[in-house]
């Protein structure tokens, strides 16, 4: 997801200035939010009539498929996401992790139900990583495949060119998108304008194709084609992949610009192109192998391949950035260990680069291109992860509507059941492709889900063991009053994962060195289940006397903890520690397995491996490395 754009509640803007502002943000949103769903015309119709589960080209089948696509776009994107799910924002932020955090923050449910909601939310987020691997592969590959339509001799060059483009895209990530990001909106604007016009030309030739807006044709298609018609739903669903991005990017652009852009521009352009492809198939059924490029005049094929490739690169970029943002949120919410997160823009804190995620995506995406060999085969692997995520979003939305908003139970049950049946139908159709590649994103999702649960549970066990081996802050203060250790002049900061207990590093230092600094601050970073915490509420200081105090720094899951910022805010509240002269003490735990618990031995070993490879607190919290002392200890879990 792209960098956060400053926005207020745009729904109350009026007049020329308000319209211009919405238009400006809408143009920016075009290049980020709508790239994925906007490039689906490259392969969605083709897979219905030329894929592994395709059906013959006939008037009734074409009208039926178009009717299903039309109502999928209307019901899933326009109604479900833009009208209802977008209401479930976490202080303006969207996305499945933000939705999960919102439910947990307001939930009064028992422990098991809370874990169920957290579990399905994490699994939904994990599935998006599989989607992030497939989308760049299928999008860029389907665009480059236009070369073999220009000249069959180019067929052997499609895979190498796709690999080169994807390699360049991932290698460029460390530079950020600040310099080239301004081009994204205009390029995608041109893309939608061109595909809309191409479709309109064919619709004018065969206006009867517009009858497909009647839902009867969709029902008739499913009734007449039985199981085969149901399986084609998996290809129909390709037209709405990317709908989750509209919700996930809500925090960057606001609800109004996204809705405005969808209704007035994106949806009409998509429908024109889909219906144009349908009209073409009625005239030229032989074009079913690539109806999108069949709309393009021969003289415009090369420019169109270039434009399509550019659009798919931008769509891929948006998804890659989304994976970076999702990873950062998961770290902040405590579901993944600390890893390197680099900021690529001084002016926009939201523009980040996560090297580990970038290389994993790169190798997986290129491997998919080489392994599957064509966008048609990749389409079989696409969709099941997205449909599962949509199902989970519907379930989570139900709990928000029922428990947080207190909507009428009957109305809520009817509404959510309606969406759930639609999602379940698409999921079932996509799941039929399980042995044709759909297993891949599910396996990736399960791996990430296991890592997230292991880290969360392992941290809980670790903190409990540390708590059992140390003193509470109050007990430590009482011990100082009874027996004062030797004090040395200076300021020391000890990081603590639990604000109510003394960190092991302090006790070890006191036990072995027999000294304590004259001024000691216990620093605790509290990661809240809201996107951002205002600076006025970010730092809380409690002084215990005898030179001891506790500083609690609160950060949201869209923020980046910084010890330098905490020092600055703490000084404003009367804590006069100097960053350049303060010594920082950290605990470095070595995990030893052995204790009996609900966590299996293999997961304990996995957790120990994750701890060893986690980024140090020194780097993550931006501490001055020359002033950090790490004290090691063994902890058995």
Swiss-Prot record:
Signal peptide: none
Chief place of localization: membrane
Transport in keyword set: yes
This protein's UniProt keywords: Cell inner membrane, Cell membrane, Ion transport, Membrane, Potassium, Potassium transport, Symport, Transmembrane, Transmembrane helix, Transport
GO terms under cellular component: plasma membrane
Lipid bilayer topology: Multi-pass membrane protein
Reactions accelerated catalytically: K(+)(in) + H(+)(in) = K(+)(out) + H(+)(out)
Function of the protein: Transport of potassium into the cell. Likely operates as a K(+):H(+) symporter.
Record-given protein name: Probable potassium transport system protein Kup
Organism: Chlorobium phaeobacteroides (strain DSM 266 / SMG 266 / 2430)
Gene name of this polypeptide: kup
């Amino acid at each position: 997801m792209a960098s956060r754009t400053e926005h207020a509640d745009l729904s109350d803007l009026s007049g020329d200035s308000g319209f211009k502002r919405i238009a400006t943000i809408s143009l920016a949103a075009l290049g980020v939010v709508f790239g994925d769903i906007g490039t689906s015309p490259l392969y969605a119709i083709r897979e219905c009539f030329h894929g592994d589960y395709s059906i013959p080209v006939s008037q009734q089948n074409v009208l039926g498929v178009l009717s299903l696509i039309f109502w999928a776009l209307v019901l899933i994107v326009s109604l479900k996401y833009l009208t209802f799910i977008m209401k479930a924002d976490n202080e303006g932020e969207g996305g499945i992790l933000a939705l999960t955090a919102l439910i947990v923050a307001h939930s009064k449910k028992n422990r098991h139900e809370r874990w169920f909601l957290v579990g399905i939310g994490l699994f939904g987020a994990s599935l998006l990583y599989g989607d992030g691997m497939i989308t760049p592969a299928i999008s860029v590959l389907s665009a480059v495949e236009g070369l073999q339509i220009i000249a069959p001799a180019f067929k052997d060059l499609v895979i190498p060119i796709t690999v080169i483009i994807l390699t360049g895209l991932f290698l460029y990530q460390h530079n950020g998108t600040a310099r080239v990001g301004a081009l994204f909106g205009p390029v995608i604007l041109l893309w939608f304008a061109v595909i809309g016009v191409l479709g309109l030309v064919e619709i004018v030739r065969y206006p009867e194709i517009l009858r497909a807006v009647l839902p009867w044709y969709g029902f008739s298609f499913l009734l007449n084609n039985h199981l085969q018609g149901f399986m084609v739903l998996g290809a129909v669903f390709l037209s709405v992949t990317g709908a989750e991005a509209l919700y996930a990017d809500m925090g960057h652009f606001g609800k109004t610009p996204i809705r405005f852009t969808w209704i007035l521009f994106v949806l009409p352009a998509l429908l024109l192109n889909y219906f144009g492809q349908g009209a073409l198939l009625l005239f030229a059924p032989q074009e079913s192998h690539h109806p999108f490029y069949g709309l393009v005049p021969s003289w415009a094929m090369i420019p169109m391949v270039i434009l399509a490739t550019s659009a798919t690169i931008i769509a891929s970029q948006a998804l890659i950035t989304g994976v970076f943002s999702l990873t950062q949120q998961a770290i902040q919410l405590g579901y993944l260990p600390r890893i390197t997160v680099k900021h690529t823009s001084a002016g926009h804190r939201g523009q980040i680069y996560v090297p580990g995620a970038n290389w994993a995506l790169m190798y997986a995406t290129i491997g998919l291109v080489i392994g599957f060999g064509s966008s048609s085969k990749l389409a079989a692997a696409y969709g099941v992860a997205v449909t599962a995520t949509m199902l989970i979003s519907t379930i989570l939305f139900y709990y928000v509507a029922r428990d947080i908003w207190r909507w009428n139970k009957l109305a809520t049950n009817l509404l959510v059941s309606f969406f759930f049946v639609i999602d379940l139908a698409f999921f079932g159709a996509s799941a039929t492709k399980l042995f044709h590649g759909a297993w891949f994103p599910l396996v990736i999702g399960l791996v990430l889900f296991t890592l997230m649960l292991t880290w969360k549970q392992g941290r809980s066990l670790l903190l409990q063991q540390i708590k059992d081996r140390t003193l509470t802050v109050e007990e430590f203060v009482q011990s100082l009053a009874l027996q004062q250790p030797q004090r040395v002049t200076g300021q020391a900061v000890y990081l603590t994962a639990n604000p109510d207990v003394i960190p092991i590093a302090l006790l070890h230092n006191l036990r072995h060195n027999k000294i304590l600094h004259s001024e000691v601050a216990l620093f605790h970073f509290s990661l809240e289940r809201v996107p951002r915490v205002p600076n006025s509420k970010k730092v809380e200081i409690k002084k215990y006397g005898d030179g001891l105090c506790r500083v609690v720094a609160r950060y949201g899951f869209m923020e980046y903890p910084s010890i330098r910022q905490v020092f600055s805010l703490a000084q404003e509240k009367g804590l006069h520690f100097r960053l350049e002269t303060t010594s920082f003490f950290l605990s470095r735990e070595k995990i030893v397995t052995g204790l009996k618990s609900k966590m299996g031995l293999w997961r304990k070993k996995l957790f120990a491996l994750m701890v060893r490879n986690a980024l140090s607190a020194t780097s993550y919290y931006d501490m001055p490395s020359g002033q950090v002392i790490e004290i090691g200890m063994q902890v058995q879990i």
